[in-house]
Amino acid sequence: MNNNNKIFQFKLVLLGEAAVGKSSLVLRFVRGHFLDYQESTIGAAFLAQTVCLNDTTVKFEIWDTAGQERYHTLAPMYYRGAQAAIVVYDIRSEDSFERAIKWVKELQRQGSPNIVIALAGNKLDLAAKRKVETAEAQQYAEENGLLFMETSAKTSQNVNELFVEIAKKLPKTPTTRPGSGRVAIAPIDNGNTGKKNKCCN
Amino acid sequence: MMKSDEGVSGNSNNNNNYKFKDNTFRKYGVEVVAYDNNNNNNNNNNNNDDNNTVTVNSRGFHISIHPFSFRNKLTINQNNGSIGGSSSSSSTSNSVSTPKPQSFYVDDAGIAKQLNQSVFDILSRSRYLSSLSHENLAEFIAAEPSQKHHDQMLIVSEDYKNSLEKQIEIQAKRQTPIPSNTIGRYAYQILKALSYLHSQDLTHRSLSLDNIKLDDNNQIKLTNYGLYYLSDHGENVSFPIGNLLYLSPESILRGAKGSSNTKADVWALGCILLHICLGYCIWQDNNPSIVTNRILHLSGYSTTQSFNSISKSFEQCELKKTIINEKQHEEYEEYDDDEDISEEEKEKRIKDIKLNNRDNMNNFINSLKREEKENSDSNSGSSNSNIGIGLNGLGKELIEIIEQCLIPNPMDRPDSETLLDHPYFNEYKNIDPYQLQWIIKPFTKSWDLPDSLESLTLKEIESYGHIGSDNNGGGGGGGGESDSDIYSGKEIYYFWKLLGGNIEKELVNKGFAKASPSVHKLPLYVPVKASLTESTNSGLNSPQPYQHQHHQHQHQHQHPNIIKSKNSTVYNNEFCLVELSNVFLKIKESFKLYGSKVFEEGIEQSNNNNNNRFNNIENNIELQIIIIREFHKLLYQYQYDDPTLSQPKIYRLAKLFVPPILRGDIWSSILGVNEREAKQLYNSINLDVKGPNDKQFELDIPRCHQYHPLLSSRQGHVQLFKILKAWSLLNLEKGCYWQGLDNVASPFLVHHFFNEPIAFASLKAFVDKYLSILYVPNNHAALSEIMLIYQQLLAYHDPELLNHLMDIQLDPNLYSIPWFITVFAHILPIDKLEILWDSILLCPSSLPNFIAASMIIQFRDSILKMNFEDGITMMSMIPSVDVHKCVSDALSMFNKTPLSTTVTKFVSNTDQELWWMQEVPFEKRKLELFPRIDIHDLINDQQKVILDIRTPLQFQQIHYPSSINVNPKLSKLQQQMEQYKGQQIVVIAPKDQGVDFTNQLIQWKFPFVSMLNGGMDSLEHGAHSLLIISNKN
């Protein structure tokens, strides 16, 4: 197997409740900086970054989505065709962990087959106010075959590590050629008819 | 001896120079009156230049800059030696249990400083102060952080050269004491101002002779009233606020920085009135320790100073027994800190503290009277004679008022409002034009007379006559039509800056800004073992470092327990007065240059033919002065008179120019906000109930436009929360909160800070106009529709760019949602957003679509070279857009685009015949790159190339004049069409056909391509008479 100098491109999506630090994780990973007050994301934001493994280079096309439940209808547009997903929660909030579990289920049901899902417990720098125990999340991740890490976008703890682990786990088959990670821009149907919308509860 | 000095007896001034304006937006400030003498020209030899006389009645109006250093709450983390924002347990800061993230910057000297919350909080509080308005308060104009010293704030305020302190000196020199009725009027006006401040929950705390100013009409103007509030009751500054000489006993007991309530100002007033009448300060010393002891002695404490009523002077004495002990002081502290205890409990506790001994004070005042009497009897030259009128010269009632002010126990001391009700002040009230304010109170069209009208005296009713009439009197040329306005201090300051004024430069020029690194700025006096008394340590533990530089002429004693540090900067009570004659001159010139008629004509012209008579207004100060005058009239008319009359005029003028200083008011009037209704609606919403989005607000608000000082302040967070919550409670049923509404609300909050009702009403009106279809539970269809219109506009104006975006699959879905769902408020910083919104508010609600198109076209050259990934990344560069260009491009696109392109064509329940007005599935319409237009747009503009792609036979039977029949299947179609490229092309196609042909034109980069909605059928239906019909049938 000779993958030297080969670049593999993957589409990765971030999901999770509002204000758990999705944008902050991406910005820490891509630009290496952190803002105390990151503007909320509306719709979605796109960023790209590469990760060098031993023998290959993995390029992530990252879709950072809006966390507010209202923007849920848009989410399928971004996770459709994604080979990887990071589902983020705030270790200080049990609600956000519950929401993360829902996202994982949705991805398992509606996401690409073989999608690599990572569960990230963010805001590790505020561990003093922790509400979600590491063991609990760890156990859930193991049961569901997810990668799991607790991260801090603020201190950058485990941020690169998380992306590297995902990169390692992604299959480097010849079919994943650059560009295949492009978003499928088919608007989602469930919002269109306007009759019954399951997403707004 | 009792001769009344002309400059002092102010009563007679009231009616002449104090015209009360009832027809202008601004109430207090610099008054300008222009008299147009053309109409009744008695003097035929009048030179043209002198046709109108302009008087600027500034009454000695000045602007002062007052720099003060605020405390940099720098916390140094000693664990790792680095400087960090969060305070750890070992941090030097003794406060903040929950660490709050802070950002730092490093200054030239490599010292990390906090770009801290205190700056933002001070700035947000300053907006409250600048919203105040009272005839006896000098207007608080602005607080601006110094660019040079990052721990310095510059307060810009209305100010006057003359003060009570100077007045006393002048009178002393002239050997004519200030007469009793003038002292009474001073007391009345100071009390009015204090009672206004107190009603706004503000305490002056540093009332003193030098910040009670007098304007040229000898009316009281209080200054420096904002510092105590601004610094969070002294928390944000490292110097004590308040002049010790006028500091109340309870303030002293609470320590240098302890909070004062409004009663402290009443004490200060008492001291000041006594000072004016005696001509000297009652404490007769300037040593902080001695003064402190004397104040406390008169308040009933046993201290090292006592007043000997026989020798009539204070004496040093042995302290026999300390009454104030630690325990009592603690009680006092408890009283301050513990908010949970009941009012009665508080009262009980404060009674325990022995402040209720009034003997010493009474004794003191009585001996003052006796001493005076003895002096005048013996006629011996006492050291203090002839400076003041003396206590015996005052009326009995005024002495009584002073005595009430000086009641040691704040619980017994009356508040300012009660004092103002004292019958003594009735004679001043009766001739006070401002007492009659209720007549023209805002929000009332007619005179809102009080119930007690019968009780008014004839004299009072007569005096109203002076108020309504504007055109008589004044210092002008008399007669003719007058054109007048009042410019507020903020506006004068704005003009001054437009004329090149810069407060930092001004300070340097006047020698105020002495550069010294802030680390050297230690308090002048550092309390080592601060104690209240010199001889015992049983006193208070609070520092008493009172010393004021403006008393430098007197000898300063060195307190043994206070160490003087070198290189220090203590609170500087100096104010830098700014010369404004250039501003006043400019205003005069403007009024002469643009008389009402000249200005009207100018607007007509510039509105009619877009000529450039009024171009470059941003740099045209004269024009801005006049435009602001016009807006004053219109905005006043809008709020208090007939809004339907003034709103179109506001539109017209705002299209010309929106002065930044009036932007908030102009916006809200364009949005149709009425102050009174806004308040009613806002107050009717119960914000105490739990709202459905409260949690989300709490997540979103702390990250909304946080670079903005007001929005990142605590006050800003609180107010934004209330506005959003009010909106969501009001829209519980149909509307709902989408993230981004916080961004939309922000500009309104910034303009109406501390005025939540107006900010809320403006937001509501804005959302109703631009966002109501999006702020619903399911907005997908509406959002898709908007993005489709945007995409079609882009195709219409820049087909090449659109083609490229489609080639690289950069769909509007992926980048433009935040644009439309917030009308750009999410993606642009507020200063840029304001420029966009100025136009958006004045134009039809389709303008945002044009703005979006012109915005992306600005980046076309880069985007055309980009692939998907670079293209989508490029979208994060949108905030760097040139908004002025964006607006002018969007407007010219708007003018070149048929109106019907952006209008929805569906009408529900239409006839089967009118198939073109029936709803077409979105999926089908989405395939159309081009916009559809209605027949009106085809008929009204003859400059179009009309391509009819029906069969030649159909064309022969019936066609639109000058239309061209084209076979869409022609082999060399592109070459054939090339001749029409660049012209407006309208395609007429048979039902359900022509999409491919028209799309093809766009793919060939033909701009301005549209399709006639309904084709020939709609023409036959709507414009049959215009068609050319073959007679063969």
Swiss-Prot record, chain A:
Description of how activity is regulated: Regulated by guanine nucleotide exchange factors (GEFs) which promote the exchange of bound GDP for free GTP.
Keywords: Cell membrane, Endosome, GTP-binding, Lipoprotein, Membrane, Nucleotide-binding, Prenylation, Protein transport, Transport
InterPro entries per UniProt: P-loop_NTPase, Small_GTP-bd, Small_GTPase
Principal location: membrane
GO biological process, alphabetically ordered: intracellular protein transport; regulation of phagosome maturation
Organism placement in taxonomy: Eukaryota, Amoebozoa, Evosea, Eumycetozoa, Dictyostelia
Residue interval(s) of motif Effector region: 38-46
Xref: SUPFAM superfamilies: P-loop containing nucleoside triphosphate hydrolases
Covalent lipid adducts (S-geranylgeranyl cysteine), residues: 199-200
Superkingdom per UniProt: Eukaryota
Membrane topology designation: Lipid-anchor
Protein name per its UniProtKB record: Ras-related protein Rab-5A
Claim: rRNA processing is one of the keywords in the record: no
Gene source species: Dictyostelium discoideum
Function: Required for the fusion of plasma membranes and early endosomes.
Any one GO CC term of the record: macropinosome
Residues given in the record as GTP binding sites: 16-24, 35-41, 64-68, 122-125, 152-154
Swiss-Prot record, chain B:
Record field: compositional bias (Basic residues): 548-558
Organism phylogeny: Eukaryota, Amoebozoa, Evosea, Eumycetozoa, Dictyostelia
Residues binding ATP: 78-86, 113
Keyword vocabulary terms for this entry: ATP-binding, Nucleotide-binding
GO MF entries: ATP binding; GTPase activator activity; protein kinase activity
Record protein name field: TBC domain-containing protein kinase-like protein
Written domain comment of the UniProt record: The protein kinase domain is predicted to be catalytically inactive.
Annotated organism of origin: Dictyostelium discoideum (Social amoeba)
Domain Protein kinase: 72-425
Family classification: Belongs to the protein kinase superfamily. Ser/Thr protein kinase family.
Residue ranges of domain Rab-GAP TBC in the record: 657-844
Residue ranges with Polar residues bias: 535-546
Highest taxon, organism lineage: Eukaryota
Region (Disordered): 1-21, 35-55, 81-101, 535-560
Low complexity bias: start-end ranges: 36-52, 81-97
